[in-house]
Structure formats: structure tokens, C-alpha cells
């Protein structure tokens, strides 16, 4: 019995030493090229297949109401073969609706969907079950945000709302870094003019997300995590420079005055289970305080 409990805890532990080998096919965030494995979500033909309960450490994604997952970065080669042959999954398979609840407790249910041509079939239902297993591991990987709460503070210090770090997922030695670009026009300016390394772009219904994959901090040493945070911040500052140079916005780009308050709300939820009112989190969308 004790052996079964230990094996179960190891199976669900997001930091266990089941490292993935280095990938030979690293994708780049692009506006012109489709992702080779995961197409953009077509909201006209999807159907729900399963659901997964979230955790407070994933509240940063809950408030976005979308959770894009670049499966090619965190799945084994065998799992990717199953994904290609038996499933029809997009880059953003998980969504939820906060309009009715208006309060985030951290335990909301993510609804997973697929785009296969035979909804309700045995293959579709089996694929939905497997997708839920994978996505549950992604939720466990969000424990990174609770273990390293200072990562968001370092990266988002004095950053404008136009580009903002939203959270991380750590799974199988891969660190997925999620950055949101606020305006569609800025996406068109940033993506063609700089490289985010191994990355993917989710041009979603509610959010524009750049997901970067870092393998340098696979051992989760604090010094490597801080180096990773500084690298992420440098990339975001480069993107801010492109926005300033290529857009003719009469309003100056200023540091977000809502970000420190949002960080306090998220930490209170993760550490003390204090729910977040959606209206309180989204109350001020402007970014006027300090010029960059």
C-alpha cells in the first residue's frame, strides 16, 4: 500500500526527474507559418470532451480564461505520436467562463475541447480522457508560480501593460514562460522583428500569448531561475523597444500601476486561499504612472 502511494505521488509530482531529451525540432513564434503540430483554435467546430479542476497556483491563467499549451514542448515522442494519429487538438485546448461566478477561488474547472470530425465516438472520448491526464500534469506544473513568487516580480517590474509576464509551467525539466501582448497591432510589430527562441504564438480569442520554453533552469536551482528571469525580462524590454519604435501612439508607454496589486491578490490566493473578485482584478486596465 505504501509503495502504491509513493508511486502515485511520484507520478503526479511536477518536479520529478523524468527529463525529456533535447528536442531537434524547435519551433519559433510566427505570424505567417502555422504550428507544425498544433493549429490555431477554430471556435466554429470544437466540442467539449472533458474537464480538469484547477489549483490556486494556476490562478494567473484562470483570470485569463484561456490556457494555451504547446504540447510538442512537454510531451514524450511516444505521446506526440498518439497526439498526431489519434487526436485533433489545437494550441489552446482549455477555456473557462468567469462571467457567471465573478470570483476566483483557484479551483475552477477547465473545459477541454477537441476538433475531431466524430464527436462522441469512442476514439474522441478516449482522446478526451488522455487529454485530461496531460492537462492535469500541466496544472501541477503551475506549482512553479507558488514556489517562485518572486519570478513575476522580477520580470514585470515597471513593465507596461502592453506586454506582461503572466505565469509559468514547469514540467519534465521544461520551463514554459507565458507572456501576453495586449494589442493585436503590437503582435504584428513584435513577432516579425525579434526572436523569442524556442517559442509558440497563440493568437487567441481573448489573449495574444507568446509561450517560450527554457531548458537552462531544468534543475530548478535558484541562481539559474534568477538568470532565466533576467533573460525573460531582457526579451520583453526588447519587445517594448520595438513597440515604441514602430507604433505612432500619442500616449506614452508607462509602467502598469495595476501589476503590483495583482501580484498581491495572486499571492494572497496561493498562500492564504483568499478568493479574488474578477471585477477587482480587472478594475483598472490603464497603465499610467511611471514613464519607461
From Swiss-Prot:
Subcellular localization, as worded in the UniProt entry: Host nucleus; Host cytoplasm
Major localization listed first in the record, in broad terms: host cell
Keyword Aminoacyl-tRNA synthetase: no
InterPro entries assigned to the protein according to its UniProt record, in alphabetical order: Adenovirus_E4_30/34 (IPR007615)
Keyword Glycoprotein set for record: no
Record keywords: Early protein, Host cytoplasm, Host nucleus
GO cellular component terms listed in the entry, alphabetical order: host cell cytoplasm; host cell nucleus
Function: Plays a major role to prevent cellular inhibition of viral genome replication by nuclear bodies. Assembles an SCF-like E3 ubiquitin ligase complex based on the cellular proteins ELOB, ELOC, CUL5 and RBX1, in cooperation with viral E1B-55K. This viral RING-type ligase ubiquitinates cellular substrates prior to proteasomal degradation: p53/TP53, LIG4, MRE11-RAD50-NBS1 (MRN) complex, ITGA3, DAXX and BLM.
Family assignment from sequence similarity: Belongs to the adenoviridae E4 30 to 34 kDa protein family.
Quaternary structure and partners: Interacts with E1B-55k.
Annotated protein name in UniProt: Early E4 34 kDa protein
Species per Swiss-Prot/TrEMBL record: Human adenovirus D serotype 9
Amino acid at each position: 500500500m505504501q509503495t502504491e502511494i509513493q508511486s502515485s505521488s511520484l507520478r503526479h509530482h511536477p518536479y520529478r526527474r523524468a527529463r525529456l531529451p533535447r528536442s531537434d525540432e524547435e519551433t519559433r513564434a510566427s505570424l505567417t507559418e502555422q504550428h507544425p503540430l498544433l493549429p490555431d483554435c477554430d471556435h466554429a467546430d470544437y466540442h467539449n470532451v472533458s474537464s480538469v479542476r484547477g489549483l490556486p497556483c494556476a490562478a494567473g491563467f484562470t483570470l485569463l480564461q484561456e490556457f494555451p499549451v504547446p504540447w510538442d514542448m512537454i510531451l514524450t515522442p511516444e505521446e506526440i505520436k498518439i497526439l498526431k494519429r489519434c487526436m485533433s487538438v489545437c494550441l489552446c485546448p482549455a477555456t473557462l467562463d468567469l462571467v457567471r461566478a465573478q470570483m476566483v477561488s483557484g479551483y475552477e474547472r477547465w473545459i477541454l475541447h477537441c476538433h475531431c470530425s466524430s464527436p462522441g465516438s469512442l476514439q474522441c472520448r478516449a482522446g478526451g480522457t488522455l487529454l485530461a491526464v496531460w492537462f492535469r500534469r500541466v496544472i501541477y506544473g503551475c506549482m512553479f508560480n507558488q514556489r517562485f513568487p518572486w519570478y513575476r516580480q522580477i520580470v514585470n517590474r515597471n513593465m507596461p501593460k502592453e506586454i506582461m509576464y503572466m505565469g509559468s509551467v514547469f514540467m519534465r525539466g521544461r520551463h514554459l514562460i507565458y507572456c501576453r501582448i495586449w494589442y493585436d497591432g503590437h503582435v504584428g510589430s513584435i513577432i516579425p522583428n525579434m526572436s523569442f527562441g524556442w517559442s509558440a504564438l497563440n493568437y487567441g480569442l481573448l489573449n495574444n500569448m507568446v509561450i517560450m520554453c527554457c531548458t537552462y533552469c531544468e534543475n530548478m536551482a535558484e541562481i539559474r531561475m534568477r538568470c532565466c528571469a533576467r533573460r525573460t525580462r531582457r526579451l520583453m524590454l526588447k519587445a517594448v523597444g520595438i513597440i515604441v519604435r514602430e507604433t505612432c501612439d500619442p500616449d506614452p508607454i508607462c509602467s502598469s500601476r495595476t501589476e503590483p496589486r495583482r501580484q498581491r491578490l495572486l499571492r494572497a490566493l496561493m498562500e492564504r486561499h483568499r478568493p479574488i473578485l474578477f471585477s477587482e482584478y480587472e478594475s483598472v486596465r490603464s497603465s499610467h504612472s511611471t514613464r519607461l
